[in-house]
């Protein structure tokens, strides 16, 4: 038996951070029901690499082990389907733009009417309460605004994005942990909760001591290539006769 068996998640997410979160929950045994828009579906269905049959390998990997339905949530019939599902699941996970489910009449207050102890988990770029809450964001925007790009690369070149979508993946893992903790707490207290994980907050938490260094010294950590900007030597990549070595 896998550790999350018995937990059911209604997954409204698309692209990467949310599906990656739900994928991890499904891998550990949660039943994940993925909800997509009719006709278009998840935008990552159109992301490469593609399999020989023309389907997106990207979508297949990050949405493995999930069940799927397509619902038009703008129609009354679609809203009723979603409300019935609210009554049968433990967790709702979404990464819509701020306020989208509320505008559809399917927000947290509606969830609690049919399932008072539900866990409602929201991933956004900038959270549910701040001045940027209505802004949308992709990984590169968050890497830039968090200072991650300013720290990455060589000093003689412009700031550099990570080779992988680290803001998305870190956020997905952070939310997965938050959901597991909320489920554990619900077993003790019988109460659900609302979870708010912002990509920007997550990246601030992952840039190690950059924020701390600025708070203590007023100095910004600059780009140092592959060297460690601390008193650790040797810590770099070095070109040797046959290739690089770290």
Q: Where are these predicted regions, by residue range?
A:
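N-terminal helix-loop segment corresponding to the beta1-alpha1 unit
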Residues: 1-191
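Acidic, glycine-rich segments within the central catalytic cores of soluble metabolic enzymes
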Residues: 145, 149-246
């Amino acid at each position: 038996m896998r550790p999350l068996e018995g937990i059911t998640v209604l997954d409204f997410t698309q692209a990467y951070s949310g599906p990656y979160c739900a994928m991890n929950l499904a891998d550990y045994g949660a039943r994940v029901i993925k909800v997509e828009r009719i006709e278009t579906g998840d935008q990552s269905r159109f992301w490469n690499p593609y399999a020989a049959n023309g389907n997106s390998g990207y979508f297949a990997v990050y949405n493995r082990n999930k069940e799927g339905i397509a619902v038009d949530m703008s129609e009354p019939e679609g809203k009723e389907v979603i409300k019935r599902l609210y009554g049968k699941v433990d967790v709702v996970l979404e990464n819509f733009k701020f306020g989208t489910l509320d505008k559809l009449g399917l927000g947290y207050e509606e969830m609690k009417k049919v399932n008072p102890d539900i866990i409602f988990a929201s991933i956004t770029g900038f959270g549910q309460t701040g001045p940027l809450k209505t802004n949308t964001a992709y990984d590169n925007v968050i890497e830039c605004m968090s200072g991650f790009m300013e720290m990455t690369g060589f000093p003689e070149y412009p700031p550099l994005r990570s080779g992988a979508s680290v803001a998305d993946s870190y956020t997905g893992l952070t939310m997965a942990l938050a959901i597991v903790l909320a489920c554990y707490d619900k077993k003790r207290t019988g109460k659900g909760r609302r979870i708010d994980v912002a990509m920007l907050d997550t990246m601030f938490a992952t840039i190690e001591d950059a924020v701390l260094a600025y708070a203590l010294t007023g100095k910004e950590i600059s780009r140092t290539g592959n060297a460690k900007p601390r008193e650790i030597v040797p810590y770099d990549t070095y070109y040797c006769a046959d290739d690089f070595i770290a």
